[in-house]
Amino acid sequence: MEHIQGAWKTISNGFGFKDTVFDGTSCISPTIVQQFGYQRRASDDGKLTDPSKTSNTIRVFLPNKQRTVVNVRNGMSLHDCLMKALKVRGLQPECCAVFRLLHEHKGKKARLDWNTDAASLIGEELQVDFLDHVPLTTHNFARKTFLKLAFCDICQKFLLNGFRCQTCGYKFHEHCSTKVPTMCVDWSNIRQLLLFPNSTVGDGGVPALPSLTMRRMRESVSRIPPGSQHRYSTPHAFTFSASSPSSEGSLSQRQRSTSTPNVHMVSATLPVDSRMIEDAIRSHSESGSPSALSSSPNNLSPTGWSQPKTPAPAQRERAPGSSTQEKNKIRPRGQRDSSYYWEIEASEVMLSTRIGSGSFGTVYKGKWHGDVAVKILKVVDPTPEQFQAFRNEVAVLRKTRHVNILLFMGYMTKDNLAIVTQWCEGSSLYKHLHVQETKFQMFQLIDIARQTAQGMDYLHAKNIIHRDMKSNNIFLHEGLTVKIGDFGLATVKSRWSGSQQVEQPTGSILWMAPEVIRMQDNNPFSFQSDVYSYGIVLYELMTGELPYSHINNRDQIIFMVGRGYASPDLSKLYKNCPKAMKRLVADCVKKVKEERPLFPQILSSIELLQHSLPKINRSASEPSLHRAAHTEDINACTLTTSPRLPVF
């Protein structure tokens, strides 16, 4: 017993185990001696013994309410001790900060350097927190039925009913919820980190970010390393508990059945993929010379991350006993500009033959998931104002869906601005009327006029002014289906003086309205100017000729039409042209734009005209053999005796 009391006195004084305690010839077994360090016996000063003081360990509180105990060896730094514990959780020391908890000052902590000798911290309690500039995001799970073919990102099996994160797109079965990575990659913040590796700190601690074109953005985003299984998955996935106490606070989601796990409650606040952060930090450290670049700090947080809708968050304190309201708070996901998804890489489109060129660009036939038409616009070195105006118009064009409108498929910005539309196998109306001289029936001409008016009525309902309406931009697709192309794009069809858009008469003069030629208004293009151009198209349909064919001087046409001295000769209309169509042509080409009808009225007039045309209705009775061309060659006996032929 004397040996036991001596050993215990040594332990309680804080000097640790001595070799004589284990090497002695005492009858006490080593197992019993090792258990003395865990006995709760007070020392002479009345304090309890800390078991970590008696061994080379450090207790560490990690993010997300996790903790661990690490062993310390001589010569190891904090970075070496905590590397493994952080790696298995998908963390990087470069993204975190380590603190020593000051128990003598409750709630306070002192930051430590990662190169600190770990041996000097034996028995202490440490805490690891995220750095403020690391983009954090939480999963936003929602139950979803996948109507299209989908597979679970965890087990790679077919997925019909499951869950999907609305932020990162991770999808999984219900029984795979415990294997979902806790890291939700916020790609809007990752793109900011990769776009601005050379950002410098400006006034007020806000990084000054350079202005980029879409081409540089596309090249920057292409540096994102691909994931292993899922495009948003992280390589450091680990399992976590799928249960959460009800006292943690309720989310702003509907209450789900208690028989299924509420996977939305398993949201974890962790940084993005460690490999992406590592690459971004490496590229940031390799880029040397800082340069002061101009940027608007209104939309930036103190760490430089774009936050268009939410204010900059306050500095986070992640003490072990902190409240969980902030952790359960749903973070709004960053919204990407939807026009981003309509941009096509120039390397994906293969141009083949040159179809033709016009006032605003050159059209090529190309291949992009099938035959497409690529119109390379005549815009050299677009200014930022032109580029933004072009993107704004593309945002309008991509919403057009109509049977009589060419389908907009995307746009390109590399090297040149270009528009990609569907390919029409047929020829343009101009080629049919004036080159091939196709002979159409009157009801066919009226139907072409109706479809054209129907497509223009749709464009005007979308507040899109064509600005270049003519027979060259009307295509007959698969028979007599009208497709209107080359609409909108006021950015390309206007002249720019510096950063200001200046209107000028561009396009084909034969289809120009008089007010457009005169250019007395700042913006002469209107719905009525499109109606005048449509009236010239009607004139082409009903005469088979171009207007002013007797005038060979272009400047003379501009002068006479602009002054109101010349107008299309309506006496050349076909003799079998209905009177209603003649009146419509005359109304559309009136010199005063306020007197011209709009397309809803035009479409209604043509539809009434179509209904009034005489039609030969086909008989609904059964076919008769008497209508055969050579009924005398049919053997009546064969008809009555052959079992294979029907008898009428």
Curated annotation (Swiss-Prot):
Binds 2 Zn(2+) ions per subunit. Residues 253-262 have a biased composition (Polar residues). The modification Symmetric dimethylarginine is found at R563. GO terms for molecular function: adenylate cyclase activator activity; ATP binding; identical protein binding; MAP kinase kinase kinase activity; protein kinase activity; protein serine kinase activity; small GTPase binding; zinc ion binding. Its EC number is 2.7.11.1. Phosphorylation at Thr-269, Ser-338, Tyr-341, Thr-491 and Ser-494 results in its activation. Phosphorylation at Ser-29, Ser-43, Ser-289, Ser-296, Ser-301 and Ser-642 by MAPK1/ERK2 results in its inactivation. Phosphorylation at Ser-259 induces the interaction with YWHAZ and inactivates kinase activity. Dephosphorylation of Ser-259 by the SHOC2-MRAS-PP1c (SMP) complex consisting of SHOC2, GTP-bound M-Ras/MRAS and the catalytic subunit of protein phosphatase 1 (PPP1CA, PPP1CB or PPP1CC); this relieves inactivation and stimulates kinase activity. Residues 275-285 have a biased composition (Basic and acidic residues). Keywords: ATP-binding, Cell membrane, Cytoplasm, Kinase, Membrane, Metal-binding, Methylation, Mitochondrion, Nucleotide-binding, Nucleus, Phosphoprotein, Proto-oncogene, Serine/threonine-protein kinase, Transferase, Zinc, Zinc-finger. A zinc finger (Phorbol-ester/DAG-type) spans 138-184. It comes from the Eukaryota. Residues 218-335 are annotated as: Disordered. ATP binds at I355, G356, S357, G358, S359, F360, G361, T362, V363, K375. The modification Phosphothreonine is found at T269, T491. Residues 241-252, 286-302 have a biased composition (Low complexity). The modification Phosphoserine is found at residues 29, 43, 233, 252, 259, 289, 296, 301, 338-339, 471, 494, 497, 499, 621, 642. Zn(2+) 1 binds at H139, C165, C168, C184. Residues 349-609 form the Protein kinase domain. The active site is at D468 (proton acceptor). Disulfide bonds: none annotated. Regulation is a highly complex process involving membrane recruitment, protein-protein interactions, dimerization, and phosphorylation/dephosphorylation events. Ras-GTP recruits RAF1 to the membrane, thereby promoting its activation. The inactive conformation of RAF1 is maintained by autoinhibitory interactions occurring between the N-terminal regulatory and the C-terminal catalytic domains and by the binding of a 14-3-3 protein that contacts two phosphorylation sites, Ser-259 and Ser-621. Zn(2+) 2 binds at C152, C155, H173, C176. Residues 331-349 are annotated as: Interaction with PEBP1/RKIP. Serine/threonine-protein kinase that acts as a regulatory link between the membrane-associated Ras GTPases and the MAPK/ERK cascade, and this critical regulatory link functions as a switch determining cell fate decisions including proliferation, differentiation, apoptosis, survival and oncogenic transformation. RAF1 activation initiates a mitogen-activated protein kinase (MAPK) cascade that comprises a sequential phosphorylation of the dual-specific MAPK kinases (MAP2K1/MEK1 and MAP2K2/MEK2) and the extracellular signal-regulated kinases (MAPK3/ERK1 and MAPK1/ERK2). Monomer. Homodimer. Heterodimerizes with BRAF and this heterodimer possesses a highly increased kinase activity compared to the respective homodimers or monomers. Heterodimerization is mitogen-regulated and enhanced by 14-3-3 proteins. MAPK1/ERK2 activation can induce a negative feedback that promotes the dissociation of the heterodimer. Forms a multiprotein complex with Ras (M-Ras/MRAS), SHOC2 and protein phosphatase 1 (PPP1CA, PPP1CB and PPP1CC). Interacts with LZTR1. Interacts with Ras proteins; the interaction is antagonized by RIN1. Weakly interacts with RIT1. This is RAF proto-oncogene serine/threonine-protein kinase. It comes from Bos taurus.
